[in-house]
């Protein structure tokens, strides 16, 4: 099994090619040598995400797939977005599960057979490894963090709507205890002087004997389409009802809100 717990994945396009091989039917995990690791899985090669109608991470993954399948470009019109959404739909609709369950399933003992590849946030994986080392005294080398060759970097914003909110914003930026807690949860902190986001987290991870994430500076930065077009594509792929939930063939809503933004 893998010894490194963080690494780049070579080409996201190659992964998508596996999912579309055999005339669109896709490869199975057993087809690409999973048996060499003592495992067997006849499911399709897909990356598991949360409910695409309700999960920000799943919607972002849709945007990543769309960007790559559109020649590293975004759709510019409703007609183009509709065509692209219909084309990538098979790469996404066979993978969703309730949002609160997806991450818990991934870290469960059965996770490697249910979801060999899962789309999660970097901070979730880092927090899991920090907790695992604290409990077991070692990293979980059965799980590896893969960075796609084309990816997004999300930067959450805190917008103060009151004096109390403004004070909270200052505390989050300056209070050592709050910053330490943020790093325990795997979050990067922006350095006020350099503007870099990795230095403090990398130092924290090194102190806790966790390998720090290292990604190539040459990797393609994927771009999301206009928000209205992205929402249109999500609705097309997920067949979402007006409340934002995916619907079954009988029109019954399924899915839940995501527990770890």
Where are the language model's segments positioned?
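A conserved helix-loop-strand patch within extracytoplasmic ligand-binding domains
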Residues: 1-54
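Active-site/pore-lining binding-face segments in mid-to-C-terminal subdomains
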Residues: 123-126, 130-170, 176-180
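Structural recognition of the beta-strand scaffold that forms the well-ordered cores
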Residues: 1, 46-49, 116-120, 146-147, ...
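Solvent-exposed coil/turn segments that connect beta secondary-structure elements
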Residues: 3-5, 52, 122-124, 163, ...
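Extracellular/periplasmic juxtamembrane helices and adjacent flexible linkers that interface
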Residues: 161-261
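Small-molecule pocket liners
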Residues: 45, 63, 154-158
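Stable alpha-helical elements in mature extracytoplasmic
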Residues: 8-11, 21, 25-28, 57-61, ...
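Ligand-binding pocket segment of bilobal, Venus flytrap-like solute-binding proteins
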Residues: 60-144
């Amino acid at each position: 099994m893998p010894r490194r717990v963080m690494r780049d994945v070579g080409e996201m396009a190659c992964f998508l090619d596996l999912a579309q091989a055999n005339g669109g039917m896709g490869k199975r995990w057993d087809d690409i040598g999973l048996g060499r690791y003592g495992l067997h899985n006849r499911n399709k090669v897909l990356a598991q995400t949360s409910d695409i109608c309700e999960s920000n991470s799943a919607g972002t993954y849709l945007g990543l797939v769309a960007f790559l399948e559109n020649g590293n470009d975004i759709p510019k019109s409703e007609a183009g977005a509709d065509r692209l959404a219909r084309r990538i739909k098979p790469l996404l609709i066979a993978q969703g599960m309730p949002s609160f369950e997806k991450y818990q399933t991934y870290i469960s003992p059965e996770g490697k057979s249910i979801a060999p590849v899962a789309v999660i946030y970097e901070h979730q994986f880092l927090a899991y490894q920090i907790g695992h080392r604290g409990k077991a005294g070692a990293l979980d080398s059965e799980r590896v963090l893969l960075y796609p060759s084309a990816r997004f970097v999300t930067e959450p914003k805190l917008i103060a709507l009151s004096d109390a909110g403004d004070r909270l914003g200052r505390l989050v930026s300056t209070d050592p205890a709050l910053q330490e807690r943020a790093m325990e949860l795997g979050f990067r902190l922006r350095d006020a002087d350099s503007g870099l986001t990795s230095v403090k987290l990398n130092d924290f991870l090194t102190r806790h004997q966790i390998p720090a994430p290292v990604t190539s500076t040459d990797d393609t930065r994927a771009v999301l389409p206009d928000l209205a077009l992205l929402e249109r594509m999500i609705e097309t792929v997920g067949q979402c009802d007006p409340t934002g939930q995916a619907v079954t063939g009988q029109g019954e809503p399924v899915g839940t809100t995501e527990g770890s933004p």
